[in-house]
Amino acid sequence: MVNIHEGDKFVVSDVELDGNYLGREEEFKSLVKIRPGQPYNADQVAETTKAFSDHFSNFGFAFARVEAVPEIDREKNLVKFVLQAEPSRRAYVRRIHIEGNDRTRDEVIRREFRQFESSWYDGDKIKLSRDRVDRLGFFTEVDVDTQEIPGSPDQVDLVVRVKEKPTGAVTLGAGFSSAEKVSLSFGIKQENAFGSGNYLGLDINTSKYNRTLVLSTTDPYFTQDGISRTIDAFYRTSRPYSGDVYVDDQVVKADQLYKIVSKGASVRFGVPFSEIDTVYFGAGFEQTKIDRGVYMPRQYEALAGKSNTAIPLTLGWGRDSRDSALAPNSGRYQRVNAELSPAGDLKYVKATYQFQQYVPVTKAVTFAFNTELGWGKGLGGNAYPIFKNFYAGGLGSVRGFEQGSLGPRATEYIGPNGSIEKYSGGSYSYLGGNKKAVMNFELIAPFPGAGNDKTLRWFTFVDVGTIYGDKEQTRGLGVINADGMRASAGIGLSWISPLGPLRLAWANPIRKQPGDELQKLQFQIGTAF
């Protein structure tokens, strides 16, 4: 048997600074976590000495010695701390070595560093450099160690150790149904193409109902100053109904259903103006055609049968201070984007805003908050284009509801002879809306038994969101304006798999509307929130 006696509780009576503080005593005093009048706390003492050492490193003192010396008054159960500091010698960085990057080129990592070789050691710049490398999203672990140089007391080497994650994915899929027999899908994505740091993606889907061809490439260092360039080209054919459709007791073939054909291309540039801020601007050309067919919602009637062109101009701003793009524990992410189409057949303005905040609750547990807002409006007295609508519901927005199901729903469609018909069986066509509001709250922790592995974590969540429709799209056209707020709560699992971010969530809708389509268990690869 082991007997443990905790002893008396001591209270901090005072905190003093002693030693060489480079004439910056007030700066160091602001870093003290030990509070007089509060019970002694070993964690606060350790946090204070570490904060002092880190602050010394910002002035080139990589090996500063800081010690919290206690002076104990046992009669009064008081303890006074004297923080003794000796900066030691100032050092500069001789070399920066990189280890563990089997695929990624050295230059991809080095260009993110703000601590340079042959420069004074700077703790803030080293931390910023580590975070910038981590935000690339290519690595599961990024560590920077400081090593002394034997015989050179004023020099150090930095060793950057990274652990690479799979950044490429090839997906092959096949599906079978009575309606379309066999459909094939193919996708290839490389976030770090040939170790260059460039993104290259190709998606192909041969389904009769949703045919897609998308090519995208991003060069994050299109210029040596860090200006990025993204080029996208796409061709999509969408037929919303994938089940058997009957008209006059006769099955309608897939090629007889109405379809939306979209094609276009865009180019976008990103110009950094601080370490965490970037301005984006670009332009594109889009052409959308709605071919008449069976089951076309009435909302598409005004745009059917012709090609509708848009020339969207984009302008945006982004700020990213997260400590990691893969599994953030602290920091903030914000992005504002505006899209204006002043020319072409479709004239509209569209704006989106996203905000994320990550707060460490403990060393292992993180609180995460995400909000997404969207707004769109037609210009020149025109309605907002319906195929530019926002959607919500499902993973990535409000979990527990069918993907894209929130907001207005069409109950009527254009029949074969131009007549107005009702969808049978209480079914709807989801229309989306021109206004969007979604909020997500998550508490994230390591999966039991996974240790500090950031690639496997579990989370609890609460989601809230809604979609509002444009009155010009819905007035008198057989629409249910199911635009009330929805909410859900549940638990989930996230895994950074070789195929990409995988998320599995079980959600219980706690606020819903009549007619909502629920999906309590949802699974998807590629969603970030």
Q: What name fits each language-model region?
A:
Residues 60, 137-141, 339, 446-452:
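Long hydrophobic segments that form regular secondary structure
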Residues 22, 103, 119-328, 332-333, ...:
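Gram-negative/organellar outer-membrane beta-barrel architecture
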Residues 59, 63-70, 136, 334-340, ...:
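Acidic, glycine-rich loop-and-beta core segments that form the ion-binding/anion-interacting portion
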Residues 156, 366-469:
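Extracytoplasmic gating/loop element in the C-terminal half of outer-membrane beta-barrel translocons
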Residues 1-136, 140-158, 162, 167, ...:
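Interaction-mediating elements
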Residues 465-488:
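Outer-membrane beta-barrel transmembrane domain signature
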